[in-house]
Curated annotation (Swiss-Prot):
Protein family membership: Belongs to the methyltransferase superfamily. RNA methyltransferase RsmG family.
Residues at which S-adenosyl-L-methionine binds: G93, L98, I144, E145, R158
GO CC annotation, single: cytosol
Glycoprotein found in the keyword field: no
InterPro entries the UniProt entry points to: rRNA_ssu_MeTfrase_G (IPR003682), SAM-dependent_MTases_sf (IPR029063)
Protein's name in the database: Ribosomal RNA small subunit methyltransferase G
EC number of the protein: 2.1.1.170
UniProt keyword Protein biosynthesis, yes or no: no
Stated role: Specifically methylates the N7 position of guanine in position 527 of 16S rRNA.
Length: 230
């Protein structure tokens, strides 16, 4: 996979150029919210340890740009997502809201719930929902397996668990015809094999991602229920 060259300049310039590289339109208001989100994450991180990444430049690339890279693939992969219809989305093991907060900023018609078992992380997401004016963003301080089935169009995770564990814990929150989507680094062949052997969910496709300024392999794993499993 070819890497996108590093982007010079300050955060605002780098963000604008990253959106251009991703062919992802972002108006001035959205860009301002994205930058405020990362700034607040840096501030909270000093006290609450939201993420192991401390460097502002690395946060911009490894958190913000990485999350932005899935917006267009989700729109292409979910017919309702690009039509303007409401989309119900769970972000499982969201931490400080990645990618959920970014998705809520970029798509106001996506109703995003960030689910995490660590209270300080969901408190941060709630703070961002208010501070950034995101009525389509909520946070749930709980384990995903403790929630009642949510009938989501899509449930997404980023560095949450193996594919089999993700499907086992979160699959019941996907409505009939919906999908599970896992953000991964290298294609996890062993995880895919374990998932397929389990039988309830199957990998529909593997979609490569190119994250601006990140020289690393990234992909999306799209999963659907196997026929006969509801």
């Amino acid at each position: 996979m070819s890497a996108v060259p590093d982007i010079p300049g300050g955060p605002a310039q780098r963000l604008a150029q990253a959106c251009d590289a991703l062919r992802l339109p972002a108006d001035a208001g959205q860009q301002q919210k994205l930058l405020r989100y990362i700034e607040q994450m840096q501030r909270w991180n000093r006290t609450y340890n939201l993420t192991a990444i401390r460097d502002p430049g690395q946060m911009l690339v490894q958190h913000l740009f990485d999350s932005l890279s899935v917006v267009a693939p989700l729109e292409r992969g979910l017919p309702a997502a690009g039509s303007g219809a409401r989309v119900k989305l769970f972000d499982v093991g969201s931490g400080g809201g990645l990618p959920g907060v970014v998705l809520a900023i970029m798509r106001a018609h996506w109703d995003v719930t960030c689910v995490d078992a660590v209270e300080k992380k969901t408190a941060f997401v709630r703070q961002m929902a208010g501070a950034l004016g995101l009525p389509n963003l909520q946070a749930a301080h709980t384990r995903i397996e403790q929630l009642e089935p949510a009938q989501c169009d899509v449930v997404i995770s980023r560095a949450f668990a193996s594919l089999q564990d993700f499907a086992k814990l979160a699959g019941r929150h996907v409505r009939e015809g919906g999908t599970l989507v896992a953000m991964k680094g290298k294609v996890p062949d062993d995880e895919i094999q374990a998932l397929q052997q389990h039988g309830h969910w199957t990998v529909e496709r593997i979609e490569p991602l190119v994250v601006p300024a990140l020289d690393a392999q990234r992909c999306l794993i799209w999963m659907r229920r196997s026929q006969g499993n509801i």
